[in-house]
Amino acid sequence: MSSPAAQTPYALVPTDAEWERLDAQHNGIAKFLDHKLAPVDLGQPKKILEIGSGSGAWAIQAAKQFPDADVLAVDQNPLPARPLPSNIRFQQLNVLEPFPFPPGSFDIVHIRFVLCHLPNGYTVLPRIIELVAPGGWLLVDDIDFLHAFEGLDKAPGVKSGFTGLIKSMESHDADPHFGKTLKGLLESSSALSEVNVQKVELPINPTPEXPALGPLSRTMRQAFSNAVGAEKLNPDTVTKGGLTREVQQAFLNEMGGDAQDWSYSVHLYFSWSQKRV
């Protein structure tokens, strides 16, 4: 692996609290997706790759659903110590560097909420597409942190927290709105024969009453609270995003309250695309 200075920029430091946050976020999203990796028949994959494996939660789900597949989880940080299915392997790497895999190596490639954090993430996507085998599936999920702050006049702490997060991402050429570009980027690839993108307009507050959206809203609200309000942040994030402890505490106080007089939404994008044969 490269030296720490060459790692991909990321606001959060790998801690037990971060692993718990990622597990909870995965579990909430998995419930929303009906515990399916994708809403299509993925066949009988033999090799599965997850890029940006974090706590390993998605890789564990994939390994259990496809016990005959070899699941490779990759990330710039090691997986936390936890029980893993026997068909999971881990490899430490930096996604900004050339992949050490031949083109077409994997029947399924998955990446969630990673491209938005990368400098010029749109340049990384074609290299990821290359890794998918002909007829295989690319599963990309990402987010758009909306700049629509009109509903936050009565929640200045929430506004400052999300503003700081967006500023810190933009400071290293990441794209907090990457999700809204995903469909166009995928459709522009001649290597894909089928592109499907599901856009989810998700209110963080007030919590939606819809049976599916309500639990997902609560999941993501808690995930954002634990991320922006984390005790340990990348120092660069604090400096460039202005996420001081005072800003964090105001964010946590309002996100943890039950006031209904403010509103904010994010857009989530879930995609499944098939590689041309």
UniProtKB/Swiss-Prot annotation:
GO terms for molecular function: methyltransferase activity. GO terms for biological process: methylation. The keyword Nucleotide-binding does not apply. Gene3D superfamilies: Vaccinia Virus protein VP39. Keywords: Methyltransferase, Transferase. Induction: Induced in strobilurin-producing conditions (on CGC medium after 6 days of growth). Its EC number is 2.1.1.-. Pathway: Mycotoxin biosynthesis. The keyword Oxidoreductase does not apply. InterPro entries: SAM-dependent_MTases_sf (IPR029063). The structure of strobilurin A was used for the development of the major class of beta-methoxyacrylate agricultural fungicides since its beta-methoxyacrylate toxophore targets the Qo site of complex III of the mitochondrial electron transport chain and prevents adenosine triphosphate synthesis. Compounds such as azoxystrobin (Syngenta) and Kresoxim methyl (BASF) are among the most widely used fungicides worldwide. This class of antifungals are used as effective treatments against a broad range of destructive fungal plant pathogens and make significant contributions to food security. It holds the Pfam family Methyltransf_23. Belongs to the methyltransferase superfamily. LaeA methyltransferase family. Methyltransferase; part of the gene cluster that mediates the biosynthesis of strobilurin A, an antifungal polyketide that contains a key beta-methoxyacrylate toxophore that targets the complex III of the mitochondrial electron transport chain. Strobilurin biosynthesis begins with construction of benzoyl CoA by step-wise elimination of ammonia from phenylalanine by the phenylalanine ammonia-lyase str11, oxygenation by str8 and retro-Claisen reaction to form benzoic acid, which is activated to its CoA thiolester benzoyl CoA by the dedicated CoA ligase str10. This is Methyltransferase str3.
